[in-house]
């Protein structure tokens, strides 16, 4: 009885301290594919009053169970721990049902029934369990260390990758993403600039059209002004010719007038001397005045002198009954006068129409029957007669 109670206590302890069954996905799977657990229905149930002896470590074929203990060197396999990131949504927990528990208990009881004949030492079993726990702790510690080392390696690798990326960007150029973003921004900027340039081009085309219209207008004005300038140039040339002709005509007239003036001055001197000689010994009826200032005064003076000489020589014969004589000669114009007439005719041909020359000679007074015949009468020949007169004689000499 004592032995049975000891076995019961160990069995209860063995059941409580038995390793839990591992499911799929905990990272400790065996490489063998999972096998279905077969439950033999022909096995007789174990009587509850017969307690099996404490069982030894028996290799189990159930999947997901970590087998610890002595392992031969031929069967050892090196496993590289690789960190696998599994999303939480992909992890499912498989909780064994009561039927599976019953099957596993039946399987263990069958094993215990088969090994009931072998009686082991409970201390040895306890020590084995402790060794298993220690190995599990050691394996967990090693796994944690491996995990920490792999984390450090991952961190170092991440830093190395970052540095390599920086070196690659520095050697190759900009970051492709940044380069793409920059190209996109430049494209948008170019689109905006293209639109602005399109608007400017439209405005410039309108301005160009307006300028072309203005150019046509100014071209027509220029052509018209050019025609007018040509006409004005021709008219200017004609006026210059006329001006030169008029200038030469005026110069000729002035030179002729100066010549006539000199001759009239000489005539005035001769008439004055003649009149003074005719009045010698008589009462002076004419006294020379100051020199005339102009040609008109000179002509007037000569005319008066001629009248005085005429009156002194011929008297007043035939003045009351003058007779007209037909014009025997036509007065011609001087070259300067002809040039002046030509210039006037060119300048104003309508006003300078040729008028009939009215160049009738002045009425010549022929001698008529007169009481006193003048000394220098054409019908008398007294030019060579000399009269001796004293200083006391006065008046005119009359030939009887």
Curated annotation (Swiss-Prot):
Keyword Coiled coil attached: yes
Region (Essential for interaction with GORASP2): 394-400
Coiled-coil region list: 126-263
Keyword tags: ADP-ribosylation, Coiled coil, ER-Golgi transport, Golgi apparatus, Membrane, Phosphoprotein, Protein transport, Transport, Ubl conjugation
Superkingdom of the source species: Eukaryota
Subcellular location: Golgi apparatus membrane
Region Disordered, annotated ranges: 1-36
Molecular function (Gene Ontology), one example: ubiquitin protein ligase binding
UniProt keyword annotation of Transport present: yes
PTM info: ADP-ribosylated by tankyrase TNKS and TNKS2. Poly-ADP-ribosylated protein is recognized by RNF146, followed by ubiquitination. Ubiquitinated by RNF146 when poly-ADP-ribosylated, leading to its degradation.
Gene Ontology cellular component list: Golgi apparatus; Golgi membrane; nucleus
Assembly and interaction partners: Interacts with GORASP2. Interacts with the GTP-bound form of RAB2, but not with other Golgi Rab proteins. Identified in a complex with RAB2 and GORASP2.
Free-text domain note: The tankyrase-binding motif (also named TBD) is required for interaction with tankyrase TNKS and TNKS2.
UniProt function note: Required for normal Golgi structure and for protein transport from the endoplasmic reticulum (ER) through the Golgi apparatus to the cell surface.
Name this polypeptide is given: Golgin-45
Gene that this polypeptide is encoded by: Blzf1
